[in-house]
Regions:
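Catalytic core and acceptor-binding pocket of nucleotide-sugar-dependent glycosyltransferases
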Residues: 144-240
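Short catalytic/ligand-binding loop motif for oxyanion handling, primarily in non-cytosolic enzymes
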Residues: 14-15, 46-49, 99-103, 124-125, ...
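A conserved donor-nucleotide-binding helix/loop in the catalytic core
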Residues: 62-94, 98-102, 106, 113, ...
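A structure-centric feature marking long, well-folded core domains of fungal metabolic enzymes
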Residues: 75-78, 102, 127-129, 174-177
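A structural signal for short, well-ordered beta-strand segments and their strand-loop junctions
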Residues: 38-39, 91-95, 115-117, 213-218
């Protein structure tokens, strides 16, 4: 058991394949030596996951109860899950469609820092309906702090005590939003909408808990496009649209080419395509060549 853990939630066939991207990069860069993975898995996906990932050191598969109403944040509401996670110093809460980079293998988080990714849910909607304006007003109405943090993505790294605090507040705010803030209908992105409520809740919780000095934005959930990877990029998010080199909708539709990279790509999009299209052994060998 390592001192740190990456947590993900697996709930369908697509997330099973997406999990392979996270898993392959975890193995490729020997991140398994410093970070465990715990995959909280719905019963509908447990057979496929255990078939592919059983008896792997530092990887735990936790089957969730069939009656449990699950999401990426409700798993932190279970006493059993909390007890399991309390054994770790740091937690990286992320989604399956995450690609870890070489830089993550040497990353050592600070105890007093909260690391978050970049999100798109705060894009401007209709005139007078800016998402961040509504979030700020709601925080003030709920007597929560607002530090002006915006475009916060779903990725979160922090000391376990901080992660529990943030996810608990996110869970509470999300339930409140769904109950009281959509009286005019469910809405459609990029305007105020129920599908993004969990993202609004996360940004609102971060604004209340994280001061400007404690928050580090941008090293997680980097763009998956033609941008060159830098030493600051710890992970890449597989965005579902508008990406030049790796669009995950096109990947699942079989519309992306199989290139067969002979060396490590320098752009994030090519890196993601290489990971998705290669097996673990190929990637480990490439990492060995890169590091030597």
């Amino acid at each position: 058991m390592n001192k740190n853990v990456i947590t993900v939630y697996i709930n369908n066939n697509q997330s099973i394949e997406e999990f392979s991207w996270l898993y392959k990069t975890w193995r490729m860069w020997d991140i398994s030596k410093t970070w465990d993975i715990i995959a909280f898995t719905d019963p509908c996906a447990i057979e496929a996951i255990t078939k592919s990932y059983s008896n792997i050191d530092c990887l735990k598969i936790i089957e969730l109860e069939a009656t449990q109403s699950c999401s990426s944040i409700t798993i932190f509401e279970s006493e059993e899950n909390v007890k399991l996670l309390l054994g770790y110093d740091f937690i990286y809460k992320t989604s399956c469609d995450t690609f870890l980079t070489k830089e993550f293998s040497a990353f050592k988080p600070w105890k007093d820092k909260i690391y978050v990714g970049i999100g798109l849910h705060a894009n401007q909607g209709a005139v007078g309906g800016l998402i961040r304006e509504k979030e700020e007003l709601l925080n003030k109405a709920l007597e929560l702090k607002w530090h002006g943090h915006t475009h916060i993505g779903g990725g979160l790294i922090g000391h376990s005590s901080i992660v529990f605090k943030i996810t608990k507040m996110q869970y509470t705010i999300n339930n409140w939003l769904l109950k009281f803030s959509f009286t005019e209908g469910v809405g459609v992105f990029p305007n105020w909408n129920t599908d993004s409520a969990i993202d609004y809740a996360f940004e609102m919780a971060i604004n209340h808990i994280a001061s400007p000095l404690s928050l580090h934005i941008g090293s997680l959930d980097s763009w998956c496009s033609s941008n060159e990877l830098t030493s600051l990029d710890l992970s890449i998010k597989a965005w579902p649209n508008n990406e030049i080199l790796f669009n995950k909708k096109k990947w699942f539709a079989g519309e992306l080419p199989s290139i067969g990279f002979s060396k490590l790509p320098i752009t994030a999009g090519e890196y993601c395509l290489m990971i998705a299209d290669s097996n673990v052994d190929q990637l480990v060998n490439m990492a060995i060549r890169e590091l030597n």
